Curated annotation (Swiss-Prot):
Catalytic activity: carbamoyl phosphate + L-ornithine = L-citrulline + phosphate + H(+)
GO BP, one annotated term: citrulline biosynthetic process
Main enzyme class: transferase
Stated role: Reversibly catalyzes the transfer of the carbamoyl group from carbamoyl phosphate (CP) to the N(epsilon) atom of ornithine (ORN) to produce L-citrulline.
Subcellular location: Cytoplasm
Pathway stated in the Swiss-Prot or TrEMBL entry: Amino-acid biosynthesis; L-arginine biosynthesis; L-arginine from L-ornithine and carbamoyl phosphate: step 1/3
PANTHER family: ORNITHINE CARBAMOYLTRANSFERASE, MITOCHONDRIAL, ORNITHINE TRANSCARBAMYLASE, MITOCHONDRIAL
Protein name (Swiss-Prot/TrEMBL): Ornithine carbamoyltransferase
SUPFAM superfamilies assigned to the protein according to its UniProt record, in alphabetical order: Aspartate/ornithine carbamoyltransferase
Keyword hit for Translocase: no
Cross-referenced PROSITE patterns: CARBAMOYLTRANSFERASE (PS00097)
Lineage top rank: taxon: Archaea
NCBIfam families named in the record: orni_carb_tr, PRK00779.1
Length: 302
């Protein structure tokens, strides 16, 4: 039976631990120049409905380093962009490539693609979740803090797709997450209810200081996701009290780290001072997309 990676909950706690351990091994092997072509003759088809820097580069480089090949597919250059049904695209691609990664506008598109594909489908981002990002985030937290169990994470800002995956990941990691968002932009009640029902430690507040107090990790993300450009002035006004700055970081534990999945709008959701500080794990976090996704690809295809 094929395996997909559409939600962070598509893997178990044990599978997550093994995947992160493998990612760290792959990272060390890359550092010393060891590359094993375990995915030789494998091809990853990558559909990008949204533009990308980190997702595209990390998956392309990852497949190359594992001995495989990645194809960049823009829907505008495919029949999918001219109205071909997703289910037909899924069936055809299943005959040509080994797996599909899609960066989609709508989560339903990812689900439909997976339902009709005979090969693994990876959610490279949707409007509901960004599970590949959370793999890298968990890896980064383990590297910096040497554990996830009991780690307190403060999410500051928009309760978006990355926030959703973070909340759901607490079921697998034992982390505690406190989300500080304006009420209008809080995470979906269905997400929070599901996480709580499964034993997660999640709390939603509106005060960023309350969330950051005693935090081991302070995380944020852009206030303006792709497709929201027309709301830029309104969103900036609403979210400015949620800026991650030195004053907010002073509420966190001594030695706390700050994370941002990028791209960052400097001096909006996070100040230059914090992003470029010793507390910043942002660049390791970005690099770890490569290693975590390589481990995921091996798990799905090797």
């Amino acid at each position: 039976m094929k395996k997909d990676f559409i939600s962070i909950l598509d893997i178990s706690r044990e599978e997550l631990a093994n995947l992160i351990a493998h990612a760290r091994k792959l990272k060390e092997e890359r550092r010393v120049g060891i590359q094993t072509p375990v995915l030789a003759h494998k091809t990853l088809g990558m559909i990008f409905e949204k533009s990308s820097t980190r997702t595209r580069i990390s998956f392309e480089a990852g497949m190359f380093e594992l001995g495989g090949h990645a194809l960049f597919l823009n829907p505008k250059d495919m029949q999918l962009g001219r109205g071909e049904a997703i289910r037909d695209t899924a069936r055809v691609m299943s005959r040509f490539v080994s797996a599909i990664m899609i960066r989609a506008n709508r989560h339903d598109e990812v689900l439909e693609l997976a339902a009709h594909a005979d090969i693994p489908v990876i959610n490279g981002l949707s409007d509901r979740e960004h599970p590949c990002q959370i793999l890298a985030d968990i890896m980064t937290i383990e590297e910096r803090l040497f554990r996830t169990e009991g780690v307190k994470v403060a999410w500051i800002g928009d309760g978006n797709n990355v926030c959703t995956s973070l909340i759901l990941s607490t079921i697998l990691t034992g982390m505690e997450v406190i989300v500080a968002s304006p009420s209008e932009f809080a995470p979906g009640e269905d997400v929070v209810s599901e996480a709580l029902r499964m034993g997660a430690k999640v709390r939603i507040v509106t005060d960023p200081r309350e969330a950051a107090t005693g935090a081991d990790v302070v995380m944020t993300d852009t206030w303006i996701s792709m497709g929201q450009e027309e709301e830029i002035d309104r969103r900036r006004q609403i979210f400015m009290p949620y800026q991650v700055n030195a004053e907010l970081m002073a509420c966190a534990k001594p030695g706390a780290i700050v994370m941002h999945c990028l791209p960052a709008h400097r001096n909006w959701e996070i100040t230059d001072e914090v992003l470029d500080s010793k507390a910043s794990a942002v660049w390791d976090q970005a690099e770890n997309r490569l290693h975590a996704q390589k481990a995921l690809l091996v798990r799905l295809l090797a």
